[in-house]
């Protein structure tokens, strides 16, 4: 009986939250009030994800100082990767769910210039990575990114690009990607998170990947009919310049520093659904557009890029959900029996959320980080 009473108490609290929460609504509310409260919620959310106790103080020189090109390159690559993954659903593991809340620091590591570019080897300085990342960092995601340049692919032809971990006789197959003419001037990404985790925990000073085309037994070795930007052998000043170009093969790495992953919060990732935007005639749960301007709405000058973003929010009534699939149906029925005049109506809540990459600075130090679950893309009744 005590357990039932506790569950009923929890449901009463749930109803109160539904009536007052600004992210989700169970009844019609003043939209301006919802907007103001949503903006204030975002203020606290961003500071919390960055583990900042308060807004950073503005350094006038830092505000006008130009962001280094290397950081802009990292930021642009992060934005591109986020856009590519918008419609990709990746089943989340328990570890992924636990680390999803806090902002991820983003680092970009270009490949080392190698004498073996003709063999399509991509080498990385692991000592440099360990020096930059430190030892107590939780690796969240690592993507090997290659910019495809069309060389001899015909309209109706394609080649399968195979990625191997290691080079030479020790190379081990990881995954592949089909490349056709439509991939010209586009980035191909390979998830190499597990491999990077193992390399970072090891002691090797240099590690690499190898690119190959599949070999059919008894047939001549197939030639690459496309090029990968930055892998051609260059000389002199041209080589030095190429090493700094954003089109060179690189690893984009997102991680949690020790002070963030020591107190992980669990946030559940959900499968992507279609985006349902509210209209003037909407009478059910939907996404209402809301643009947040960091300077105008929050009074912040310490976020350099972007200047704002569409945070959006969920609003609209939800009908009662009484079905066998709802694991709370029996508890709700019991609650309804003991409280015939009360309501345990479901709320309109976010279903799919997307990340927001930012460049911000504390004092005169610029950083690139990715804030998870910042953009509401679809809603559901729950």
From Swiss-Prot:
One of its GO terms (cellular component) is extracellular space. Transforming growth factor beta-1 proprotein: The precursor proprotein is cleaved in the Golgi apparatus to form Transforming growth factor beta-1 (TGF-beta-1) and Latency-associated peptide (LAP) chains, which remain non-covalently linked, rendering TGF-beta-1 inactive. SUPFAM superfamilies: Cystine-knot cytokines (SSF57501). Expressed in blood leukocytes, kidney macrophages, brain, gill and spleen but not in liver. InterPro entries: Cystine-knot_cytokine, TGF-b_C, TGF-b_propeptide, TGF-beta, TGF-beta-rel, TGFb1, TGFb_CS. GO terms for molecular function: cytokine activity; growth factor activity; transforming growth factor beta receptor binding. One of its GO terms (biological process) is positive regulation of cell division. Glycans are attached at residues 76, 116, 125. Latency-associated peptide: Homodimer; disulfide-linked. Latency-associated peptide: Interacts with Transforming growth factor beta-1 (TGF-beta-1) chain; interaction is non-covalent and maintains (TGF-beta-1) in a latent state; each Latency-associated peptide (LAP) monomer interacts with TGF-beta-1 in the other monomer. Transforming growth factor beta-1: Homodimer; disulfide-linked. Transforming growth factor beta-1: Interacts with TGF-beta receptors (tgfbr1 and tgfbr2), leading to signal transduction. Interacts with EFEMP2. Transforming growth factor beta-1 proprotein: Precursor of the Latency-associated peptide (LAP) and Transforming growth factor beta-1 (TGF-beta-1) chains, which constitute the regulatory and active subunit of TGF-beta-1, respectively. Transforming growth factor beta-1: Multifunctional protein that regulates the growth and differentiation of various cell types and is involved in various processes, such as normal development, immune function, microglia function and responses to neurodegeneration. Activation into mature form follows different steps: following cleavage of the proprotein in the Golgi apparatus, Latency-associated peptide (LAP) and Transforming growth factor beta-1 (TGF-beta-1) chains remain non-covalently linked rendering TGF-beta-1 inactive during storage in extracellular matrix. Belongs to the TGF-beta family. This is Transforming growth factor beta-1 proprotein. It comes from Oncorhynchus mykiss (Rainbow trout).
């Amino acid at each position: 009986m005590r357990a039932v009473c506790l569950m009923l108490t929890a449901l009463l609290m749930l109803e109160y939250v539904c009536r007052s929460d600004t992210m989700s609504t169970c009844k019609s509310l003043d939209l301006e009030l919802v907007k103001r409260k949503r903006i204030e919620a975002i203020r606290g959310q961003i500071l919390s994800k960055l583990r900042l106790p308060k807004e950073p103080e503005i350094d006038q020189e830092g505000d006008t100082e130009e962001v280094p090109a290397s950081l802009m390159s990292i930021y642009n690559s992060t934005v591109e990767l986020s856009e590519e993954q918008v419609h990709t659903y990746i089943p989340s593991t328990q570890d992924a769910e636990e680390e999803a809340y806090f902002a991820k620091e983003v680092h970009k590591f270009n490949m080392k210039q190698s004498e073996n570019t003709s063999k399509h080897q991509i080498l990385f300085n692991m000592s440099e990575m360990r020096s930059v990342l430190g030892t107590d960092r939780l690796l969240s995601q690592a993507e090997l990114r290659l910019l495809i340049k069309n060389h001899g692919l015909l309209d109706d032809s394609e080649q399968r690009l195979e990625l191997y971990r290691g080079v030479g006789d020790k190379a081990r197959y990881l995954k592949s990607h089909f490349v056709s003419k439509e991939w010209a001037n586009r980035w191909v990404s390979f998830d190499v998170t597990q491999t990077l985790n193992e390399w970072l925990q090891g002691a090797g000073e240099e590690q690499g990947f190898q690119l190959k085309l599949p070999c059919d037994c008894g047939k001549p070795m197939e030639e690459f009919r496309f090029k990968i930007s930055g892998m051609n052998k260059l000389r002199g000043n041209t080589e030095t310049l190429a090493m700094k170009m954003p089109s060179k093969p690189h690893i984009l790495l997102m991680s949690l520093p020790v002070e963030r992953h020591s107190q992980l919060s669990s946030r559940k990732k959900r499968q992507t659904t279609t985006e349902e935007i509210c209209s003037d005639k909407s009478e059910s749960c939907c996404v209402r557009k809301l643009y947040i301007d960091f300077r105008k709405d929050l009074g912040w000058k310490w976020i350099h890029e972007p200047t704002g973003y569409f945070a959006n929010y969920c609003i609209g009534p939800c009908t009662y959900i009484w079905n066998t699939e709802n694991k709370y149906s029996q508890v709700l029925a019991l609650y309804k029996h003991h409280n015939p005049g009360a309501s345990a109506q479901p709320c309109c809540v976010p279903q799919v959320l997307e990340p927001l990459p930012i460049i911000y600075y504390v004092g005169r130090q610029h950083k690139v980080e990715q804030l998870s679950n910042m953009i509401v893309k679809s809603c559901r009744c729950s």
